[in-house]
Amino acid sequence: MGVQVETISPGDGRTFPKRGQTCVVHYTGMLEDGKKFDSSRDRNKPFKFMLGKQEVIRGWEEGVAQMSVGQRAKLTISPDYAYGATGHPGIIPPHATLVFDVELLKLE
């Protein structure tokens, strides 16, 4: 499957991230059963990453690149585009499909 992007609320439809730009996002990460494992919203601090530098899982690299500034989307990411057979011990089980609610706040 890779990554599936479903729009929750649209962005500007014009400003898409490019490799080397820093994406500033708010997100909530959940397992398929809806169990939350992480949220920048809970910390009240947006998360930043540079696109194309493998700072985040592949599902984010490809999913966020399809979003425009201001867009909020549900990213459903298969294990091979997330943490795979290893998972993230104590947080994400092996072979887990992940669901993220991501809002692209701005680009830097």
Swiss-Prot record:
Residues 20-108 form the PPIase FKBP-type domain. The modification N6-succinyllysine is found at residue 53. Inhibited by both FK506 and rapamycin. Keywords: Acetylation, Cytoplasm, Isomerase, Membrane, Rotamase, Sarcoplasmic reticulum. It holds the Pfam family FKBP_C. It is an enzyme of class 5 (isomerase). This is Peptidyl-prolyl cis-trans isomerase FKBP1A. It comes from Homo sapiens. The lineage of its organism: Eukaryota, Metazoa, Chordata, Craniata, Vertebrata.
